[in-house]
């Protein structure tokens, strides 16, 4: 069947009715957005001669994504999260807001309310016999290189098995999640465990979509950050650990050139020992630059 009816007056009038454009109530912007989305989908059905069977198969997949709470997982896989970053980068460039550590995607696994500590935090509440001890630290400064005392550094990551607290019910709440207030020189420090990379669940709805596209669903080992300070632009970012096979092949498109960090094995690290962290550690250093701004809305999480 090669029927094409999208451009007919009947279909165009029908689209306006479906989107509520003939009604006085509702939200005008919402109507325009729905009209655009429906128009593009209707045209796609025409252009690719999508059958009723194929349509209902897609509906079943959407239902499965919802039941598995995987829309937040598929979103970065289809590039939506990175596209939003690209738009924010373009807005910064247009406003001549330059410099600072690059942003990258937040991901769906942030949980507010992590315990707060001054200068140093131990993040690993749960034993992780397979995990390497991580000594994670860095300095928060402005684009002129001046330290930012009191900067708020929120950090979260998975354990050595790829699970996140709250989502992996075997973990203590807020395991591997902390908020650290940088010291008078802008430094933050944490003891934790080296996270592992992980993939989307085999056979899950997200995996089905990615396989349809001939793509994998793997993420490298990575660590998430929110960083904020008065008078500076809020930063959402993450670092991928160098040496992971997917460091530069992240299905979520989160890798950026300046956001890969090396892990270095150190015996009896002197600075770590000052905070009670003994033995062999894997040191990961991530220094952060925040861009100055007087706009209050840019100082908060987008």
Curated annotation (Swiss-Prot):
Q: Where does Fe cation bind?
A: 164, 198, 222, 224
Q: In which pathway does it act?
A: Aromatic compound metabolism; beta-ketoadipate pathway; 5-oxo-4,5-dihydro-2-furylacetate from catechol: step 1/3
The protein's required cofactor(s) are namely: Fe(3+)
Please list the reactions this protein catalyses.
catechol + O2 = cis,cis-muconate + 2 H(+)
Write out the GO MF terms: catechol 1,2-dioxygenase activity; ferric iron binding
Output the SUPFAM superfamilies linked to this UniProt entry.
Aromatic compound dioxygenase (SSF49482)
EC number per UniProt: 1.13.11.1
- Which is one Pfam family of this protein? Dioxygenase_N
Q: Does the keyword Metal-binding apply?
A: yes
What does the record list as GO biological process? beta-ketoadipate pathway; catechol-containing compound catabolic process
* Cofactor note as given: Binds 1 Fe(3+) ion per subunit.
**What does the UniProt keyword field contain?**
Aromatic hydrocarbons catabolism, Dioxygenase, Iron, Metal-binding, Oxidoreductase, Plasmid
Does Iron appear among the keywords?
yes
* InterPro entries cross-referenced by the UniProt entry: Catechol_dOase_N, Cchol_dOase_prob, Intradiol_dOase_C, Intradiol_dOase_core, Intradiol_RC_Dioxygenase
Q: Which family does it belong to?
A: Belongs to the intradiol ring-cleavage dioxygenase family.
Q: This protein is called what?
A: Catechol 1,2-dioxygenase
């Amino acid at each position: 069947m090669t029927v094409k009816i999208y451009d007919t007056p009947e279909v165009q009038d029908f689209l306006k009715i479906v989107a509520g454009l003939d009604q006085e109530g509702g939200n005008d912007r919402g109507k325009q957005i729905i009209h655009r989305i429906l128009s593009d989908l209707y045209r796609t059905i025409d252009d690719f001669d999508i059958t009723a069977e194929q349509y209902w198969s897609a509906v079943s997949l959407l239902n499965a994504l919802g039941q598995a709470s995987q829309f937040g997982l598929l979103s970065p896989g289809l590039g939506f999260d990175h596209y939003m970053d690209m738009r924010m980068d373009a807005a910064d460039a247009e406003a001549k807001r330059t410099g600072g550590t690059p942003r990258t995607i937040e991901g769906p696994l942030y949980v507010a309310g992590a315990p707060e500590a001054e200068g140093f935090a131990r993040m690993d509440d749960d034993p992780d016999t397979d995990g390497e001890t991580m000594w994670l630290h860095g300095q928060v400064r402005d684009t002129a290189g001046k330290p930012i005392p009191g900067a708020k550094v929120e950090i979260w990551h998975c354990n050595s098995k790829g699970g996140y607290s709250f989502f992996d019910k075997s973990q203590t709440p807020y395991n591997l999640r902390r908020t650290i207030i940088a010291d008078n020189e802008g430094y933050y420090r944490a003891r934790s465990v080296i996270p592992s990379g992980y993939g989307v669940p085999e056979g899950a709805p997200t995996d089905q979509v990615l396989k349809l596209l001939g793509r994998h669903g793997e993420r490298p080992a990575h660590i998430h950050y929110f960083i904020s300070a008065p008078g500076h632009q809020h930063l959402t970012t993450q670092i991928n650990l160098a040496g992971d096979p997917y460091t530069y092949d992240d299905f979520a498109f989160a890798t950026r050139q300046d956001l890969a960090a090396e892990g270095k094995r150190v015996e009896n690290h002197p600075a770590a020992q000052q905070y009670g962290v003994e033995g062999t550690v894997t040191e990961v250093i991530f220094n952060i630059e925040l861009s100055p701004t007087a706009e209050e809305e840019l100082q908060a999480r987008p």
